């Protein structure tokens, strides 16, 4: 998911999206541990998605406007 997509979301939607990413990350780590993970790069994508979402929330909290 692109940063622009995150910026278009409301805070509530962002929190739901971050929660969904966290759940997905948990499941991916579980699959990794059991040897059933098909796409290991997805773990990195999900972690970055969580980071992007949290960054946008923090920017809004501090009232920083970014293009």
Curated annotation (Swiss-Prot):
Keywords: Ribonucleoprotein, Ribosomal protein. GO terms for biological process: translation. The keyword Translocase does not apply. Pfam families: Ribosomal_L29. One of its GO terms (molecular function) is structural constituent of ribosome. Signal peptide: none annotated. One of its GO terms (cellular component) is cytosolic large ribosomal subunit. NCBIfam families: L29 (TIGR00012). Belongs to the universal ribosomal protein uL29 family. This is Large ribosomal subunit protein uL29. It comes from Desulfitobacterium hafniense (strain Y51).
